Amino acid sequence: MTRSISISVLIISVLIMIYVITRTSISNAYPIFAQQGYENPREATGRIVCANCHLANKPVDIEVPQAVLPNTVFEAVVRIPYDMQLKQVLANGKRGGLNVGAVLILPEGFELAPPDRISPEMKEKMGNLSFQNYRPTKRNILVIGPVPGQKYSEIVFPILSPDPATKKEVHFLKYPIYVGGNRGRGQIYPDGSKSNNTVYNATGAGLVSKIVRKEKGGYEITIADASDGHQAVDIIPPGPELLVSEGEYIKLDQPLTSNPNVGGFGQGDAEIVLQDPLRVQGLLFFLASVILAQIFLVLKKKQFEKVQLAEMNF
């Protein structure tokens, strides 16, 4: 009897552990929605696929150095601005703070800097962020999030530039960098279904004959077609505010709820030059030559003026 109880307790413990691990992986899977559905986050049109779920258009900004030398670590700063006072609708229908996330698409050869190459000052700017590659084979595409927007509306990516001496496919050129950044939850899930962070429209026209408030939040709205009496039931999840009432006549696709979304997605780009050190040295040598030539010219002119003055006095 004791043995069977011990086995039962062990099985229950294992099941609980599996549940916790599964729930954790699901909650952490949000940043990789795009990774699961798209081989490349940037479409041929230039659109970043995050816009398929985050429908509202919002600004995003990226700041990188104008030029970098090979095999050096630099900062790519992504800013995702929004009103910190705003609250979004959470999955349970309650209100909470906004999260942010970003995808950074670097040129081939550029990648996340290893921890031992990141300076203490840069680590302090990064905070406790954990970046990941979009794919194991796409080390030049980085993703982060969701992370609290109150703390990380400015995200510092530590980037290592490539060295053409060791990577033959890399050249000393000007390269584009693309970024996408979102604040708040999306309106559509990757499977195409709506989240509770969007507006819900009527699936039919007619009389709102009944509205039932569900125990866990949300509504069931029954719409009776005036022509044939056919009834359609629209399910509204908890979160959006209801705009219609019983006895009201509505049209097809008329909004049944408000739009609770306060976030959105934006994308931008920047350019960076992978600079050849020999070119820099050549430029410095040229500038030094010009300066020396100017100095010698001034000295020669003064010497000539002294000679002229001496001849005049003579």
Swiss-Prot record:
Chief place of localization: plastid
GO biological process: photosynthesis
Cofactors (names): heme
One Pfam family cited in the UniProt record for this chain: Apocytochr_F_N
Organism: Illicium oligandrum (Star anise)
GO cellular component, one term: chloroplast thylakoid membrane
Similarity-based family: Belongs to the cytochrome f family.
SUPFAM superfamilies membership: Cytochrome f subunit of the cytochrome b6f complex, transmembrane anchor (SSF103431), Cytochrome f, large domain (SSF49441), Rudiment single hybrid motif (SSF51246)
PANTHER family: CYTOCHROME F, PTHR33288
Cofactor note text: Binds 1 heme group covalently.
Keywords: Chloroplast, Electron transport, Heme, Iron, Membrane, Metal-binding, Photosynthesis, Plastid, Signal, Thylakoid, Transmembrane, Transmembrane helix, Transport
Function of the protein: Component of the cytochrome b6-f complex, which mediates electron transfer between photosystem II (PSII) and photosystem I (PSI), cyclic electron flow around PSI, and state transitions.
Oligomeric form and interacting partners: The 4 large subunits of the cytochrome b6-f complex are cytochrome b6, subunit IV (17 kDa polypeptide, petD), cytochrome f and the Rieske protein, while the 4 small subunits are PetG, PetL, PetM and PetN. The complex functions as a dimer.
Protein's recorded name: Cytochrome f
The organism's taxonomic lineage, starting at the top: Eukaryota, Viridiplantae, Streptophyta, Embryophyta, Tracheophyta
Cellular localisation: Plastid, Chloroplast thylakoid membrane
Superkingdom to which the source organism belongs: Eukaryota
Signal peptide: 1-29
InterPro entries named among the record's database cross-references: Cyt-f_TM, Cyt_f, Cyt_f_lg_dom, Cyt_f_lg_dom_sf, Rudment_hybrid_motif
Membrane spanning stretches: 280-300
Sites where the protein binds heme: 30, 50, 53-54
GO molecular function annotations of the record: electron transfer activity; heme binding; iron ion binding
